C-alpha cells in the first residue's frame, strides 16, 4: 500500500514537472520576442521618430474608442436616478404666450372704482340738469360755457370717479374673450390738452385708470400744449403724483395738436399708441377690442365706437344691447370729415358686433395704432400746423399705403362734441387750408382740383406755392409704393359721388339785376329754399357747378342740386348719382344765350326778385332773370 502511494506521487510529480517545463519554455520564448521587438522599436525610434508619433496617435485613437465603448455600455444600463431637464433658451425677440383666453382676473383694471352714490349729480352716466341756479351760479355757468364751449359748471359738479351704470353693450361684446396667443400688446394712452377744464381732463384720466387692464396700460402721457391756466401747472403736477403711470410732458409754446401728439408718441414706451381727447369717458371693456385687433393685424388702425356725451348735461349716450345702426367716417370735397350710415355690403360682411367696420376715413381724435407701424407709415405730417386736415391725410395715407382703418363696435368711448372750438388759431384759420393743400398735393392726384375749386384760400396757397416742402411726404409715398387716389375711390369709397373733374362752369351765380349772388344759406342740408346774398367770392355757400348732365350742383358737403318747383326754388338731394341713375326734370337747367336759367320741365326761368329766388314766366328783358355764372377769383 505504501509502495502504491509512492508510485502515485512520483507520477504526479513527473506530470507537473513536464507542465512547468512547457510553461517555462513559452514564457522564455515570449521574453525573447519582447526583447527583439524592443530592440527593433529602439532602432526604428532612433531612425524614424515621426513614425513613433503616428503610432502614438493611433494608440490614442484606440484608447478613445475604448472609452467610448465603455460609456456606451454605461449609458445602456438602466438609470436609477432621473436628471433635471435642460431649459431651452427662447430666441431673442420671441414673446412667449400661453394658450387659451385671458381671464377676468388677468384683465383687472389699474384701479378699482370707489363706491358710488346713485343720487350724485350725473351718477351712472345720467344727465345733470342745471336749473334753478342762483345769480352767481348762473354767471359761473356762462363763464364756463364761454371759455370751454360746454357746460363746465355741470362737469365740475359731477364726480371725477363716476361710473356709467350697467354694461349695456350687446351680449357678444360682453362675453367676448381674447386669446393669450398672440398676447395683447401694451399701450401708451396719449392725451393732449390746451387750457382744458380741470374736471373733464381728470375725469378722462380716472376713466382710463378704472377701465383699462393693468397688464395692458403701460402709461398715460398728458401732453400740455402750452396751457396758460394756472391750475394746469403745479396743481396738476401735484395731483398726478399719486399715479405712478401718469406722466406730463409740456410744450413751452403752442404748436397745436399735431406736434403735441408727435411729442407724446416720441416719449411713449409701449407697443401701441392710443390717442384720446381730453374730454372723454371710457366705457367697460373699451381697450381690449382695440388691442386685440392690432395683435391680429399689425396694419390695422382702429377707433372705438364714439358715443356722445351731451355738452350741456354730460349725459353719456350708452350703447344699445341690441346693437345699433352704426356710422362710418367719410369726407366731402371740401375735405371735411363727416359721418354716414353703413352701406349694405358692409352690413352683410359683418356677422356680429365683434366684427370691425371698414371706414373710408376716421375722426382722428380717438384711435389705437402699433407704435412701430405709426412710425413706418409716416406718423403725422410734421409740417402741418396746429390742427385740421391731419385725420383726412392719415386716412388716405393708411388706405393707399397698404393699411386699413376700422371701427370696433365693442369698444365704446364717450366724447363731448362741441359745436365750435374754444381755441384760437395763432396764425388764423389759414393754417387749416394750408394743411389741406399739403394732403391734397400728395395724396389726391388730379382730384385735388375738385377741392381747389371749392376753397379759394386753398387755391391761392397753391398759386403762391405757400404750402411748404413736400419732399419728405412724397418720399414716404414712393418708399411704401402707395396706390393712387383713383384706386382709393374705386376700392375703398366707391359710394362717393365724384364731381366732374372739368365741369362746364364752376364758381358763383350772380344776378345781373342786383349785386347779389345765389346762396344756399346757413345749415342748408337740403329741403330749404335758397337765398340771395351779398357776393363774397370765397366759394363755400356760394359755390356752384354746372355739370355735364345740365345740373346746377352745390355738392360740397352733400350732393345737393337746384330743384325747380312752383314758387321758391329749393336745394335738394341730386337725383343723378352716377352708377346708372338719371337726372329728373326738376333738376335740369339750360343756360340760354340771353343769360336766362331755364327749366324745361316746368318751362319757367329763375328770378332774383325777392329774398329767395323763384321760378317765373320767362322774360328776356327782365334783368332779375339774367345771371352771370363765373369762376371765383
UniProtKB/Swiss-Prot annotation:
Glycosylation-annotated residues: 132, 297, 484
Pathway where this protein functions: Protein modification; protein glycosylation
Protein name, UniProt field: Polypeptide N-acetylgalactosaminyltransferase 3
Cytoplasmic side: 1-19
The reaction(s) this protein catalyses: L-seryl-[protein] + UDP-N-acetyl-alpha-D-galactosamine = a 3-O-[N-acetyl-alpha-D-galactosaminyl]-L-seryl-[protein] + UDP + H(+); L-threonyl-[protein] + UDP-N-acetyl-alpha-D-galactosamine = a 3-O-[N-acetyl-alpha-D-galactosaminyl]-L-threonyl-[protein] + UDP + H(+)
Necessary cofactors: Mn(2+)
Function statement: Catalyzes the initial reaction in O-linked oligosaccharide biosynthesis, the transfer of an N-acetyl-D-galactosamine residue to a serine or threonine residue on the protein receptor. Has activity toward HIV envelope glycoprotein gp120, EA2, MUC2, MUC1A and MUC5AC. Probably glycosylates fibronectin in vivo. Glycosylates FGF23.
Membrane topology summary: Single-pass type II membrane protein
Effect noted on mutating residue 519 to H: Loss of ability to glycosylate FGF23
Tissue: Expressed in organs that contain secretory epithelial glands. Highly expressed in pancreas, skin, kidney and testis. Weakly expressed in prostate, ovary, intestine and colon. Also expressed in placenta and lung and fetal lung and fetal kidney.
Regions of this protein lying in the Lumenal compartment: 38-633
Further comment: Overexpressed in many differentiated carcinomas, suggesting that it may serve as a marker of tumor differentiation.
A Gene Ontology biological process term: multicellular organism growth
Family: Belongs to the glycosyltransferase 2 family. GalNAc-T subfamily.
Gene name, Swiss-Prot/TrEMBL: GALNT3
Lineage of the organism: Eukaryota, Metazoa, Chordata, Craniata, Vertebrata
Superkingdom classification of source: Eukaryota
A single GO molecular function term of this UniProt record: carbohydrate binding
InterPro entries on file: GalNAc-T, Glyco_trans_2-like, Nucleotide-diphossugar_trans, Ricin_B-like_lectins, Ricin_B_lectin
Domain Ricin B-type lectin: 504-630
Residue numbers binding Mn(2+): 277, 279, 415
Amino acid at each position: 500500500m505504501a509502495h502504491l502511494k509512492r508510485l502515485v506521487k512520483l507520477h504526479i510529480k513527473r506530470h507537473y514537472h513536464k507542465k512547468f517545463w512547457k510553461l517555462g519554455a513559452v514564457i522564455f520564448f515570449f521574453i525573447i520576442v519582447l526583447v527583439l521587438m524592443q530592440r527593433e522599436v529602439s532602432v526604428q525610434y532612433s531612425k524614424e521618430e515621426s513614425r513613433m508619433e503616428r503610432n502614438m496617435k493611433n494608440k490614442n485613437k484606440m484608447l478613445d474608442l475604448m472609452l467610448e465603448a465603455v460609456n456606451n455600455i454605461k449609458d445602456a444600463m438602466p438609470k436609477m436616478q432621473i436628471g433635471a431637464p435642460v431649459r431651452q433658451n427662447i430666441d431673442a425677440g420671441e414673446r412667449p404666450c400661453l394658450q387659451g383666453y385671458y381671464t377676468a382676473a388677468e384683465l383687472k383694471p389699474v384701479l378699482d372704482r370707489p363706491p358710488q352714490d346713485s343720487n350724485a349729480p350725473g351718477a351712472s352716466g345720467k344727465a345733470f340738469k342745471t336749473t334753478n341756479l342762483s345769480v352767481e351760479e348762473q354767471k359761473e355757468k356762462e363763464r364756463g360755457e364761454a371759455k370751454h364751449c360746454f357746460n363746465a359748471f355741470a362737469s365740475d359738479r359731477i364726480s371725477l370717479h363716476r361710473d356709467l351704470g350697467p354694461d349695456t353693450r350687446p351680449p357678444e361684446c360682453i362675453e367676448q374673450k381674447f386669446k393669450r396667443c398672440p398676447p395683447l400688446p401694451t399701450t401708451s394712452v396719449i392725451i393732449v390738452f390746451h387750457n382744458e377744464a380741470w374736471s373733464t381732463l381728470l375725469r378722462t384720466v380716472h376713466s382710463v385708470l378704472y377701465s383699462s387692464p393693468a397688464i395692458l396700460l403701460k402709461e398715460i402721457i398728458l401732453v400740455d400744449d402750452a396751457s396758460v391756466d394756472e391750475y394746469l401747472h403745479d396743481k396738476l403736477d401735484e395731483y398726478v403724483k399719486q399715479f405712478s403711470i401718469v406722466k406730463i410732458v409740456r410744450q413751452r409754446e403752442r404748436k397745436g395738436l399735431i406736434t403735441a401728439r408727435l411729442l407724446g408718441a416720441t416719449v411713449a414706451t409701449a407697443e401701441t399708441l392710443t390717442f384720446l381727447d381730453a374730454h372723454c369717458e371710457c366705457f367697460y371693456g373699451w381697450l381690449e377690442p382695440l388691442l386685440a385687433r392690432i395683435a391680429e393685424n399689425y396694419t390695422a388702425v382702429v377707433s372705438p365706437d364714439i358715443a356722445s356725451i351731451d355738452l350741456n348735461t354730460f349725459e353719456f349716450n350708452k350703447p344699445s344691447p341690441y346693437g345699433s345702426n352704426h356710422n362710418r367716417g367719410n369726407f366731402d370735397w371740401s375735405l371735411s370729415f363727416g359721418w354716414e350710415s353703413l352701406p349694405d355690403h358692409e352690413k352683410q360682411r359683418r356677422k356680429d358686433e365683434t366684427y370691425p367696420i371698414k371706414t373710408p376715413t376716421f375722426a382722428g381724435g380717438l384711435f389705437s395704432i402699433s407704435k412701430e407701424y405709426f412710425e413706418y407709415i409716416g406718423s403725422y405730417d410734421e409740417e402741418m400746423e396746429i390742427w385740421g386736415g391731419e385725420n383726412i391725410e392719415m386716412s388716405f395715407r393708411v388706405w393707399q399705403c397698404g393699411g386699413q382703418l376700422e371701427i370696433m363696435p365693442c369698444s365704446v368711448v364717450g366724447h363731448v362734441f362741441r359745436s365750435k372750438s374754444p381755441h384760437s388759431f395763432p396764425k388764423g384759420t389759414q393754417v387749416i387750408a394750408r394743411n389741406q393743400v399739403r394732403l391734397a398735393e400728395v395724396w389726391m392726384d388730379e382730384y385735388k382740383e375738385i377741392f381747389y375749386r371749392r376753397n379759394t384760400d386753398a387755391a391761392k396757397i397753391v398759386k403762391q406755392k405757400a404750402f411748404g416742402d413736400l419732399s419728405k411726404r412724397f418720399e414716404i409715398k414712393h418708399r411704401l409704393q402707395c396706390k393712387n387716389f383713383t384706386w382709393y375711390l374705386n376700392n375703398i369709397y366707391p359710394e362717393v359721388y365724384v364731381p366732374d373733374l372739368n365741369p362746364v362752369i364752376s364758381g358763383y351765380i350772380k344776378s345781373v339785376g342786383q349785386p347779389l349772388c345765389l346762396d344756399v344759406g346757413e345749415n342748408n342740408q337740403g329741403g330749404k329754399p335758397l337765398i340771395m346774398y351779398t357776393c363774397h367770392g370765397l366759394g363755400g355757400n356760394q359755390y356752384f357747378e354746372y355739370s355735364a348732365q345740365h345740373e346746377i350742383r352745390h355738392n360740397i358737403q352733400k350732393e345737393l342740386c337746384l330743384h325747380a318747383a312752383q314758387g321758391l326754388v329749393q336745394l335738394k338731394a341730386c337725383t343723378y348719382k352716377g352708377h346708372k341713375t338719371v337726372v329728373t326734370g326738376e333738376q335740369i337747367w339750360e343756360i340760354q344765350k340771353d343769360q336766362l336759367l331755364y327749366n324745361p320741365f316746368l318751362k319757367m326761368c329763375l328770378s332774383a326778385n325777392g329774398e329767395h329766388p323763384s321760378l317765373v314766366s320767362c322774360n328776356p328783358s327782365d334783368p332779375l332773370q339774367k345771371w352771370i355764372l363765373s369762376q371765383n377769383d
